[in-house]
């Protein structure tokens, strides 16, 4: 029976699985947005996936992560973006439409607002910028939609919203990277050494041909090759010590009585 691997259907994950499919029938690929794959992993419907960092933190009693994989940035992320009609410091009491695709980005926004003493109502809605901004004071988008909207800077009803990058905002508050996702599995279902080895090989290959990956992803995501290459080269894929420190800080700001010693990682 093949191992079921959850693949987030966003461009920033492409370097981790580029050319992975040709390696045979040992792996079944399951594509989805983070919220879908999070649910499937916890239900035992997939074996290993990139899981949103907040879900890894919340479900630390059930999950174990690979020790050397992450989706993280030090500073701007370019694809977790808040579009807003007035400056962020004036959003106290605002209604902010938030994407339903990722719990981590919504929690990150909540943490950042609280860090600035801002109390806003976060309203989960379908991720469509125009409808979000017509009915709310601000809108949180993630992934390829956020990247495209931030690049194009189109108007909504004749007005152009302000744009804030949450990765950059996190760095300004903490001086740490932000880890958006880690590879994780259920504690009682470790991934095979073969699968982990293939993932490491795929990452090395993808990062080694990053321009090729950017050329492949560019037309799919409707952005130029230079924009896509800059975007992909910005990510930290190895879950180094600063990325772990950022994850722990996020846990401390998000979860009461959080103890980082409860986080578990598979052997290297």
Regions found by a protein language model. Give the residues of each.
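Bilobed "Venus flytrap"/periplasmic-binding protein-like clamshell domains
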Residues: 1-22, 32, 78-132, 136, ...
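Beta->alpha turn/N-cap motifs
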Residues: 10-13, 33-34, 45-62, 67-69, ...
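Alpha-to-beta junction loops
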Residues: 26, 42-51, 118, 134-141
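Short, hydrophobic alpha-helical packing/hinge segments within bilobed ligand-binding/sensory domains
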Residues: 37-40, 128-130
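Hydrophobic/proline-rich hinge and linker segments of small-molecule sensing/allosteric domains
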Residues: 69-88, 172-188
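Pocket-lining segment of extracytoplasmic ligand-binding domains
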Residues: 124-216
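Secondary-structure end/capping motifs
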Residues: 189-253
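Long, low-complexity C-terminal extensions of enzymes
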Residues: 244, 251-268
